[in-house]
Amino acid sequence: MTAEAPPLGELEAIRPYPARTGPKGSLVYKLITTTDHKMIGIMYCVACISFFFIGGLLALLMRTELAAPGLQFLSNEQFNQLFTMHGTIMLLFYATPIVFGFANLVLPLQIGAPDVAFPRLNAFSFWLFVFGATIGAAGFITPGGAADFGWTAYTPLTDAIHSPGAGGDLWIMGLIVAGLGTILGAVNMITTVVCMRAPGMTMFRMPIFTWNIMVTSILILIAFPLLTAALFGLAADRHLGAHIYDAANGGVLLWQHLFWFFGHPEVYIIALPFFGIVSEIFPVFSRKPIFGYTTLVYATLSIAALSVAVWAHHMFATGAVLLPFFSFMTYLIAVPTGIKFFNWIGTMWKGQLTFETPMLFSVGFMVTFLLGGLTGVLLASPPLDFHVTDSYFVVAHFHYVLFGTIVFATFAGIYFWFPKMTGRLLDERLGKLHFWLTFIGFHTTFLVQHWLGDEGMPRRYADYLPTDGFQGLNVVSTIGAFILGASMFPFVWNVFKSWRYGEVVTVDDPWGYGNSLEWATSCPPPRHNFTELPRIRSERPAFELHYPHMVERLRAEAHVGRHHDEPAMVTSS
């Protein structure tokens, strides 16, 4: 007998199946007991995207309600619950924890560490977030319904008289528990970055994403304990009659100061990591090193420092804050953000650009975030802010900066690192469909809301009069919202299909031009990430490993410092 080998062209890589499947329930047991940072990162991402879908569903209900005046298929109370829980879920149960999803997936790999510094604390942080978020959202199944005082929880709306019932209490306790998980996660990330970098990985050789996670974690340690303390005070007011936020002693403004001193650093806590994600993606698809690495780091540090000095721009309309100071500081924080834009543009400038899905989402992030940033500069001016505060103009502004940053960069990161985590590539055609539906749906929904706010439509209203003239733009906005909702279908199908049947990745770096260390190990990485580490001589160790013939040229062309092989430049006067 002779055996005939198949032609080489017919052979394709397949993922080998395990010798046998484990006993029933073994996967659940593994998920509950795991301390592997990669597994925990995937669990964070799945949980956060699930909450993102729930928050989006609440938003669709609100947009449907506002499509026409007098519709009232939701009661006013239900509408209040929806906008409260929508804001809470999106900001605190999706945006903040998914930061730790990406940090867990990528950060130990980027610094050449076998795991995070405290693996069990890492798992504990995740479960605190899951249970805290579940407690916070559980108000929907109580007789009085969920919390209905807005995600900012302004007093006296949150006191026992105006918001009786379990929904508000569950909201407060859920945020305390989830916030504790966030604080512990930040402690873990700072320790990991400081103590577990590979030999040769100096601070200024760390990837930008790692820098941003470290700075974000420091901000979390500044902001979140304050929120926890403020929430405990609110619970004491509701149950013990503590009178901390009593209007009679100025407590209403005290709550606003405490909340926004958390709230403004919070928006940078959920922006900086996503700046880091796109800063990892632009160089790879531009075939160039990041432009202005050091400047990017200092811009990140500047944003973090300034973010704790602008909180009262949320309070211009109270008349109780120093307008010139907070206005000036808000203008000032736009400067380092603008510097980042020039870094990203400089990275793409004259690069060999290709527009795979991660790059598309990153460019979508830049366009959307730029528009949101410009309306932010408008709102930094108190005379303008007085006119549009608490209107749909503000709603449009913060959705542009938050959706533009978090959602576009989340999807960019998922498409970028999915092959590293699973060993399979996501489908490019579905990815591009997902991007264009998201981009068109988002801008259709929120661009018109600037004009609605300018015409005087207040936020958080469940209805409006036919004579107000708001219906046309609201219909456009609602249509956009449903397009945005539909954009999630190709994404979910893509992840489900590719997880099981996607093209298998057979190389360490499927994109071909990866810079940081995660592209110097297998897809997916082994349990402790690396079997061997390349030498780290710059901020691009994986690129230098895969393109050793480029190293000398990269050193020669790097416009930093003086080259020792050239004579010193002599200047004559």
From Swiss-Prot:
Cu cation binds at H264, Y268, H313, H314. The chain crosses the membrane at residues 40-60, 89-109, 121-141, 170-190, 213-233, 258-278, 290-310, 315-335, 359-379, 398-418, 433-453, 476-496. InterPro entries: Cyt_c_oxase-like_su1_dom, Cyt_c_oxase-like_su1_sf, Cyt_C_Oxase_1, Cyt_c_Oxase_su1_BS, Cyt_c_oxidase_su1_bac. Pathway: Energy metabolism; oxidative phosphorylation. It holds the Pfam family COX1. It is a multi-pass membrane protein. GO terms for cellular component: plasma membrane. The keyword Transmembrane helix applies. One of its GO terms (molecular function) is heme binding. Its EC number is 7.1.1.9. One of its GO terms (biological process) is aerobic respiration. It is found in: Cell membrane. The keyword Translocase applies. There is a cross-link at H264-Y268 (1'-histidyl-3'-tyrosine (His-Tyr)). It is an enzyme of class 7 (translocase). The modification N-acetylthreonine is found at T2. It catalyses: 4 Fe(II)-[cytochrome c] + O2 + 8 H(+)(in) = 4 Fe(III)-[cytochrome c] + 2 H2O + 4 H(+)(out). Fe(II)-heme a binds at H86, H399. Heme a3 binds at H397. It comes from the Bacteria. Keywords: Acetylation, Cell membrane, Copper, Electron transport, Heme, Iron, Membrane, Metal-binding, Respiratory chain, Translocase, Transmembrane, Transmembrane helix, Transport. PANTHER family: CYTOCHROME C OXIDASE SUBUNIT 1. Cytochrome c oxidase is the component of the respiratory chain that catalyzes the reduction of oxygen to water. Subunits 1-3 form the functional core of the enzyme complex. CO I is the catalytic subunit of the enzyme. Electrons originating in cytochrome c are transferred via the copper A center of subunit 2 and heme A of subunit 1 to the bimetallic center formed by heme A3 and copper B. Belongs to the heme-copper respiratory oxidase family. This is Probable cytochrome c oxidase subunit 1. It comes from Mycobacterium tuberculosis (strain ATCC 25618 / H37Rv).
